[in-house]
Amino acid sequence: MRKNASALKRSRQNLKRKIRNVSVKSELKTIEKRCINMIKAGKKDEAIEFFKFVAKKLDTAARKRIIHKNKAARKKSRLNVLLLK
């Protein structure tokens, strides 16, 4: 890597963004698992409310391009299928 100022700045920016993106992706995985566990435990009413929260988080991540919009749509669809069973 070059040692000029702009290359160093880009490196710092990339590191900050990577840390933030990993954090958001980890949070998404955690809340998806919580929603699935609620559904499997038979807590439908709680799961429906929590699904709205999960969908909102997925849409936000897709809008910020942390995950692809199709991935967000796929995850919401699969959670919804589980919820309606």
UniProtKB/Swiss-Prot annotation:
Function: Binds directly to 16S ribosomal RNA.
Highest taxon in the source lineage: Bacteria
HAMAP family assigned to the protein according to its UniProt record, in alphabetical order: Ribosomal_bS20
One GO MF term attached to the UniProt entry: small ribosomal subunit rRNA binding
Family: Belongs to the bacterial ribosomal protein bS20 family.
Protein name as annotated: Small ribosomal subunit protein bS20
GO cellular component terms, A-Z: cytosol; small ribosomal subunit
Keyword Magnesium found: no
Any GO BP annotation: translation
Keywords: Ribonucleoprotein, Ribosomal protein, RNA-binding, rRNA-binding
InterPro entries: Ribosomal_bS20, Ribosomal_bS20_sf
Organism annotation: Borreliella burgdorferi (strain ATCC 35210 / DSM 4680 / CIP 102532 / B31) (Borrelia burgdorferi)
